[in-house]
């Protein structure tokens, strides 16, 4: 990738992330954010940031969130709350995760088609309905799986078995049902 191509890709990612963050903050400021789910994730990440068990009073008195869904990857978000302990930080994390998922898509497409088509593929991804729906629905842990899955496909395509294995293990920390997604990826790779 040339410097110019890298700058173009970075500009697209920064623009998308900025739009996602702006949309997320506007939803929060106008009381459009889904208080139930956002409240749960805010409490859980806040507890992790304080080195406490991930309890959520939104789910119930002393409700341990890992009893609802298994998503220990949320503990990795604690440092973000050390910087700014606010539910809107989850909107920033979501925007960064979605934008980061475009990098392996670009690398995958560029190897096959060239810079222009790869950049168009990234733009299409960042503007796609699934991404817009995720941004419009506030933070959910599954959003963290998007870049991991994208990098996993890139690693498999490049026959980077150890990296793919590590990414597959990391994907399992996103949510308990990501094993089904890994099964689908394995079936596609076997064909």
Question: What annotation goes with each model-predicted range?
Answer:
Residues 1-21:
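Start-transfer (signal-anchor) and selected internal transmembrane alpha helices
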Residues 18-39:
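Helix-to-loop transition at the C-terminal end of transmembrane segments
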Residues 25, 40-64, 72-73:
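Extracytosolic helix-loop segments that constitute the early lumenal/periplasmic catalytic or substrate-binding loops
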Residues 50, 69-93:
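Juxtamembrane segments of multi-pass membrane glycosylation machinery
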Residues 88-112:
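Transmembrane-helix motifs of polytopic, lipid-linked glycan transferases
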Residues 100, 104-107, 124, 143-168, ...:
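Specific aromatic-rich, kink-prone transmembrane helix
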Residues 118-129, 168-172:
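Short helix- or helix-capping micro-motifs
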Residues 134-142:
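Short acidic/glycine- and proline-prone juxtamembrane loop motifs at membrane-interface regions
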